[in-house]
Regions:
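Nucleotide/phosphate-binding sheet-loop regions of phosphoryl- and nucleotidyl-transfer enzymes
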Residues: 1-208
């Protein structure tokens, strides 16, 4: 119903939706003892499609929502693995930048811009090595540098900063998943398998 409303009302939401989402997030926070944006025990979320009929790989997904320059430090502490935390953050920026902010390969570019940054940086770090260099060879400070370069790319391509507010991240992600219902690959898939566009999709928000 929300998806149908979204497309019928210039990609806006029913007035009751924000209250319902906030109430659902609050219940999840209480159950897990974590809080969205908290600096000690941050709640991280995934946002993905809940289409009536399975459409594997066709719809957009966001993982590790809730990470920013502060909550990533809390994840590093709670996990005992700073590199893991910063790599989650790096991947979140890449995913959000692509899906929500439209930072994608431009006409004439051979590679995804985020992947190009990774490859170029690894060439800087390991200039004498040939062939593919495993991302796992990057240490935490080097992953932090990727985060910085990713955010600079988002600013340059999207014209705005990567959002640090988890609620802004959440609403951006919800809109992107609804928007992906009508993307080219989803339309082609529905035509092939006889899935009506009028069905729309749910958006599932879950704890990581």
């Amino acid at each position: 119903e929300v998806c149908t409303y979204f497309y019928a009302n210039k990609q806006s939401y029913p007035k009751v939706l924000e209250e319902q989402v906030r109430a659902s997030v609050a219940r999840t926070e209480k159950q897990l003892g974590k809080k969205l944006g908290d600096l000690k025990k941050p709640l991280l979320l995934s946002v993905r499609s809940g289409a009536r009929d399975s459409m594997p790989g066709m719809m957009d997904t966001i993982l590790n929502l809730g990470l920013n320059d502060e909550t990533v430090e809390a994840l590093a502490t709670s996990s005992g693995n700073a590199r893991f935390a910063w790599d989650c953050y790096r991947r979140f920026i890449q995913m959000y930048g692509d899906v929500v902010m439209g930072v994608q390969k431009l006409q004439g570019e051979e590679h995804d811009p985020f992947e190009h940054i990774i490859d170029s940086y690894k060439e800087e770090l390991f200039p004498k090595e040939k062939g593919e260099i495993d991302d796992n060879r990057l240490n935490v400070s080097q992953v932090k540098e990727l985060v910085s370069r990713f955010k600079a790319l988002v600013k340059k391509r999207a014209g705005s900063d990567f959002p640090t507010c988890p609620w802004e991240q959440l609403w951006g992600s919800v809109g992107a998943v609804f928007g992906s219902w009508m993307n080219d690959r989803a339309n082609v898939y529905r035509r092939k398998y006889g899935i009506p566009a009028s069905w729309g999709t749910a958006v599932n928000v879950q704890a990581m």
